[in-house]
Amino acid sequence: MTANFDGARFRQVLGHLPTGVVIVTGLDAQAQPVGVTIGSFVSVSLDPPFVGFFIGKSRSWPDISEGTLFCANVLSDAQTELCWRFGKDPADGATNRFDGLEWQKSANGSPILSGILASIDCTVESVTQVGDHRFVLGRVTSLNTTDVKNNAMVFYKGKVGGVAIHGE
Protein backbone atom coordinates (compact mmCIF):
# COMPACT_ATOMS: atom_id res chain seq x y z
CA MET A 1 0.00 0.00 0.00
CA THR A 2 1.27 3.52 -0.73
CA ALA A 3 2.80 5.34 2.23
CA ASN A 4 0.09 8.02 2.58
CA PHE A 5 -2.86 5.88 1.54
CA ASP A 6 -5.59 5.36 4.16
CA GLY A 7 -7.03 1.85 3.62
CA ALA A 8 -9.74 2.31 6.25
CA ARG A 9 -10.94 5.50 4.52
CA PHE A 10 -10.89 3.72 1.16
CA ARG A 11 -13.18 0.98 2.54
CA GLN A 12 -15.46 3.52 4.22
CA VAL A 13 -15.91 5.58 1.05
CA LEU A 14 -16.42 2.59 -1.25
CA GLY A 15 -18.87 1.14 1.28
CA HIS A 16 -21.33 3.72 -0.07
CA LEU A 17 -21.55 1.72 -3.29
CA PRO A 18 -23.95 -1.23 -2.84
CA THR A 19 -22.82 -4.55 -4.30
CA GLY A 20 -24.72 -7.77 -4.90
CA VAL A 21 -23.99 -10.82 -2.79
CA VAL A 22 -23.49 -14.36 -4.12
CA ILE A 23 -22.16 -17.59 -2.71
CA VAL A 24 -19.74 -19.24 -5.12
CA THR A 25 -19.94 -23.01 -4.73
CA GLY A 26 -18.09 -25.98 -6.18
CA LEU A 27 -16.76 -29.40 -5.30
CA ASP A 28 -13.35 -30.11 -3.80
CA ALA A 29 -11.01 -32.94 -4.87
CA GLN A 30 -13.02 -35.43 -2.77
CA ALA A 31 -16.30 -34.27 -4.42
CA GLN A 32 -17.38 -32.54 -1.19
CA PRO A 33 -19.33 -29.26 -1.47
CA VAL A 34 -17.44 -26.05 -0.71
CA GLY A 35 -18.43 -22.41 -0.97
CA VAL A 36 -17.56 -18.82 -0.14
CA THR A 37 -19.52 -15.54 0.07
CA ILE A 38 -18.57 -12.98 -2.60
CA GLY A 39 -19.51 -9.29 -2.63
CA SER A 40 -17.79 -8.34 -5.89
CA PHE A 41 -19.63 -10.46 -8.49
CA VAL A 42 -20.09 -8.72 -11.87
CA SER A 43 -21.26 -9.31 -15.41
CA VAL A 44 -18.22 -8.93 -17.68
CA SER A 45 -19.30 -9.78 -21.24
CA LEU A 46 -22.38 -10.93 -23.15
CA ASP A 47 -20.50 -12.40 -26.11
CA PRO A 48 -18.86 -14.56 -25.01
CA PRO A 49 -20.81 -14.79 -21.74
CA PHE A 50 -18.38 -13.98 -18.91
CA VAL A 51 -18.86 -13.10 -15.26
CA GLY A 52 -16.22 -12.35 -12.68
CA PHE A 53 -15.43 -11.72 -9.04
CA PHE A 54 -12.56 -10.83 -6.76
CA ILE A 55 -11.38 -13.25 -4.10
CA GLY A 56 -9.00 -12.47 -1.23
CA LYS A 57 -7.26 -14.92 1.06
CA SER A 58 -10.15 -17.41 1.21
CA ARG A 59 -9.30 -20.92 2.34
CA SER A 60 -12.28 -22.25 0.34
CA TRP A 61 -11.33 -20.85 -3.06
CA PRO A 62 -8.35 -23.20 -3.70
CA ASP A 63 -10.70 -26.18 -3.17
CA ILE A 64 -13.28 -24.74 -5.58
CA SER A 65 -10.76 -23.70 -8.23
CA GLU A 66 -9.16 -27.17 -8.25
CA GLY A 67 -12.20 -28.46 -10.13
CA THR A 68 -12.34 -25.44 -12.49
CA LEU A 69 -16.17 -25.37 -12.21
CA PHE A 70 -18.30 -23.17 -9.99
CA CYS A 71 -21.84 -21.95 -9.49
CA ALA A 72 -22.70 -18.41 -8.38
CA ASN A 73 -25.78 -18.55 -6.12
CA VAL A 74 -27.52 -15.13 -6.09
CA LEU A 75 -28.75 -14.53 -2.53
CA SER A 76 -32.10 -13.08 -1.50
CA ASP A 77 -32.45 -10.56 1.30
CA ALA A 78 -33.89 -13.35 3.49
CA GLN A 79 -30.58 -15.26 3.49
CA THR A 80 -28.47 -13.20 5.90
CA GLU A 81 -27.51 -16.21 8.04
CA LEU A 82 -26.39 -18.07 4.91
CA CYS A 83 -24.32 -15.08 3.78
CA TRP A 84 -22.42 -14.94 7.08
CA ARG A 85 -22.10 -18.73 7.33
CA PHE A 86 -20.19 -18.83 4.03
CA GLY A 87 -18.36 -15.57 4.78
CA LYS A 88 -16.66 -16.93 7.90
CA ASP A 89 -13.34 -18.66 7.34
CA PRO A 90 -13.55 -22.41 8.13
CA ALA A 91 -10.35 -22.08 10.19
CA ASP A 92 -12.23 -19.75 12.57
CA GLY A 93 -14.03 -22.71 14.11
CA ALA A 94 -16.84 -22.86 11.57
CA THR A 95 -18.38 -26.27 11.05
CA ASN A 96 -19.02 -27.67 7.59
CA ARG A 97 -20.86 -24.84 5.88
CA PHE A 98 -23.24 -27.27 4.19
CA ASP A 99 -24.36 -29.02 7.40
CA GLY A 100 -28.15 -28.91 7.57
CA LEU A 101 -28.54 -27.06 4.26
CA GLU A 102 -30.76 -28.10 1.38
CA TRP A 103 -29.03 -28.02 -1.97
CA GLN A 104 -29.03 -29.77 -5.32
CA LYS A 105 -26.45 -30.24 -8.05
CA SER A 106 -26.34 -27.74 -10.89
CA ALA A 107 -25.77 -28.71 -14.51
CA ASN A 108 -21.99 -28.69 -13.88
CA GLY A 109 -22.32 -30.57 -10.56
CA SER A 110 -21.78 -27.57 -8.27
CA PRO A 111 -24.16 -26.97 -5.36
CA ILE A 112 -27.26 -24.82 -5.91
CA LEU A 113 -28.47 -23.61 -2.52
CA SER A 114 -32.16 -23.66 -1.63
CA GLY A 115 -33.95 -20.28 -1.53
CA ILE A 116 -31.65 -18.36 -3.88
CA LEU A 117 -32.86 -16.01 -6.63
CA ALA A 118 -30.68 -17.32 -9.46
CA SER A 119 -27.80 -19.67 -10.25
CA ILE A 120 -25.00 -19.17 -12.76
CA ASP A 121 -22.82 -22.16 -13.72
CA CYS A 122 -19.32 -21.36 -14.96
CA THR A 123 -15.96 -22.78 -15.90
CA VAL A 124 -12.90 -20.88 -14.70
CA GLU A 125 -11.52 -19.05 -17.74
CA SER A 126 -8.66 -17.28 -15.94
CA VAL A 127 -7.42 -16.12 -12.55
CA THR A 128 -5.37 -12.92 -12.46
CA GLN A 129 -3.57 -11.40 -9.48
CA VAL A 130 -4.74 -7.78 -9.03
CA GLY A 131 -3.21 -6.04 -6.01
CA ASP A 132 -4.07 -8.01 -2.86
CA HIS A 133 -6.88 -9.99 -4.57
CA ARG A 134 -7.30 -12.36 -7.49
CA PHE A 135 -9.83 -11.69 -10.25
CA VAL A 136 -11.64 -14.85 -11.34
CA LEU A 137 -13.12 -14.76 -14.84
CA GLY A 138 -15.81 -17.38 -15.41
CA ARG A 139 -17.32 -18.51 -18.70
CA VAL A 140 -21.07 -18.95 -18.21
CA THR A 141 -22.26 -22.43 -19.22
CA SER A 142 -25.84 -22.30 -17.89
CA LEU A 143 -28.01 -20.00 -15.82
CA ASN A 144 -31.42 -20.12 -14.17
CA THR A 145 -33.78 -18.05 -12.06
CA THR A 146 -36.04 -19.42 -9.34
CA ASP A 147 -39.59 -18.65 -8.21
CA VAL A 148 -38.37 -16.97 -5.01
CA LYS A 149 -40.08 -13.56 -4.72
CA ASN A 150 -37.70 -11.88 -2.26
CA ASN A 151 -35.48 -8.96 -3.20
CA ALA A 152 -31.78 -9.34 -3.92
CA MET A 153 -29.27 -9.11 -1.09
CA VAL A 154 -26.81 -6.22 -1.22
CA PHE A 155 -23.74 -5.31 0.82
CA TYR A 156 -23.84 -1.63 1.83
CA LYS A 157 -21.82 0.28 4.44
CA GLY A 158 -20.57 -2.95 6.00
CA LYS A 159 -24.00 -4.55 6.33
CA VAL A 160 -26.23 -6.80 4.24
CA GLY A 161 -29.87 -6.13 3.44
CA GLY A 162 -32.38 -6.00 0.62
CA VAL A 163 -32.92 -3.64 -2.24
CA ALA A 164 -36.33 -2.32 -3.22
CA ILE A 165 -36.97 -1.03 -6.72
CA HIS A 166 -39.26 1.99 -6.92
CA GLY A 167 -42.21 1.57 -9.27
CA GLU A 168 -42.64 -2.17 -8.81
Q: Each predicted region: which residue ranges?
A:
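Basic, polyanion-binding surface patches
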Residues: 1-168
